[in-house]
């Protein structure tokens, strides 16, 4: 792969990974400080084909009071704008670091609101040594599904914009903070979580990370899907193991798992006082590069894990877990002009149960994306994408909702 593409991809991972690597660095006493980040913006053109869709659908729908199915926005893509600082030092034979980052965004579709929101997705410390591994304490990207997300080619672009998920509006016309990319159409969002995690040393390409993470509440409307509120007396548990290899045929294979005891589930079919249930998920993936061709395959399955976001619509209104599964296939090719061309297909499915069979609940969200990513410099990339998103309902009388999305823009890493 050409060095320009390597730098671009490395920059993408840099903005999403745990500890930043060599952006702008300087020494401050015993510490080395690194500042890095990215800025992007895209012109997004959306054509929502339908006025209604299933709950949990990611194909945006027309608003009931709007005759025009088209919408436009200027927004950040999948990655928010990013500014991160990492300070590292080695004392008493221990490598230590602290990372804090900020995420201002370009979204917003109304006056006097400042044009989007700001986030604080990372604030953590690490300590360790290459002989025994490292420990992370604080808020960072979750472990489960993180590698699937970082290998998604739409990370540098827009992908899906989102439908009735999230704020329940057409994201592409609302000026939402970020777009969805392949989240919910191929993998569950890893999210940003408080955690204590241990990562092994690199053992000839083998790495493993296990950790306890902040337990999530289940998300639902309590009519179609149960929801939970309040705290939990147990953590969530996540882990991932991977093996990487180099040479003419480079690549990485990984497996992962998630488990949480979800407490205080409430719904119309649950007795007063709520109930508890287990949520679990498993994943496997592989990504390879041969000359200028990149291939990625990923799959996951869950019980109670839900779809799009972890524990979102994972339980029916009686508190019973729903099964979910999905994955994506992706192929990219770097031309002699350094343009990275890619195509990806992803799908996420959510089963219904006996208690809610045939309701207007999302059965499947799928997406196909074709994209072109052209580096102008080591750090600046022009992006053009087209995505088609479909959402299918368990309700037989509800037609599938469809959306076409075109986007052009630029992203710069430093």
Q: Which residues does each predicted region cover?
A:
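Outer-membrane beta-barrel channels and translocator barrels
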Residues: 2, 28-30, 90-92, 130-133, ...
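Outer membrane beta-barrel
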Residues: 24-45, 67-218, 233-235, 243-245
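Transmembrane beta-strands of outer-membrane beta-barrel proteins
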Residues: 33-41, 96-100, 135, 206-210, ...
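Outer-membrane beta-barrel architecture
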Residues: 84-86, 124-127, 197-199, 240-242, ...
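Outer-membrane beta-barrel "beta-signal"
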Residues: 376, 402-414
């Amino acid at each position: 792969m050409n060095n320009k593409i390597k730098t671009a991809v490395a920059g993408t991972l840099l903005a999403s990974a745990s500890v930043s690597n060599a952006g702008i660095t300087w020494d401050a006493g015993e510490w080395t400080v690194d500042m890095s980040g990215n800025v992007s913006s895209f012109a997004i053109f959306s054509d929502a084909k339908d006025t209604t869709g299933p709950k949990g659908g990611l194909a945006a729908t027309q608003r009931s009071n709007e005759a025009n199915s088209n919408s436009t926005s200027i927004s950040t893509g999948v990655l928010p704008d990013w500014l991160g600082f990492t300070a590292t030092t080695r004392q008493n034979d221990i490598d230590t670091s602290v990372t804090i980052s900020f995420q201002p965004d370009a979204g917003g579709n109304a006056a006097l609101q400042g044009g989007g929101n700001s986030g604080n997705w990372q604030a953590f410390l690490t300590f360790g040594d290459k002989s025994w591994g490292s420990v992370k304490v604080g808020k960072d990207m979750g472990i489960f599904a993180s590698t699937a997300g970082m290998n998604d080619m739409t990370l540098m672009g827009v992908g899906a914009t989102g439908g009735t998920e999230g704020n329940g509006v057409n994201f592409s016309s609302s000026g939402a903070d970020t777009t969805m990319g392949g989240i919910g159409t191929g993998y569950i969002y890893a999210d940003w979580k408080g955690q204590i995690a241990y990562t092994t040393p690199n053992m000839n390409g083998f790495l493993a990370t296990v950790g306890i993470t902040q337990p999530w509440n289940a998300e639902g409307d309590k009519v179609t899907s149960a929801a939970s509120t309040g705290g939990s007396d147990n953590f969530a548990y996540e882990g991932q193991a991977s093996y990487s290899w180099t040479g003419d045929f480079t690549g990485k294979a990984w497996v992962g798992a998630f488990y949480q005891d979800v407490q205080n589930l409430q719904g119309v079919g649950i007795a007063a006082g709520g109930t508890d249930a287990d949520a679990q998920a498993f994943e496997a993936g592989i990504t390879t590069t041969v000359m200028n061709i990149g291939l990625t395959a990923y799959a996951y399955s869950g019980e109670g894990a839900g779809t799009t976001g972890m524990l979102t619509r994972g339980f029916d209104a009686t508190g019973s877990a729903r099964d979910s599964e999905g994955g994506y296939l992706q192929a990219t090719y770097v031309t002699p002009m350094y343009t990275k061309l890619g195509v990806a297909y992803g799908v996420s499915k959510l089963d219904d149960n006996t208690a809610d069979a045939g309701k207007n609940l999302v059965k499947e969200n799928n997406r196909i994306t074709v994209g072109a990513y052209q580096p102008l410099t080591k750090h600046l990339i022009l992006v053009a994408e087209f995505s088609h998103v479909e959402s299918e309902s368990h309700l037989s009388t509800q037609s599938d909702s469809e959306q076409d999305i075109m986007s052009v823009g630029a992203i710069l890493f430093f």
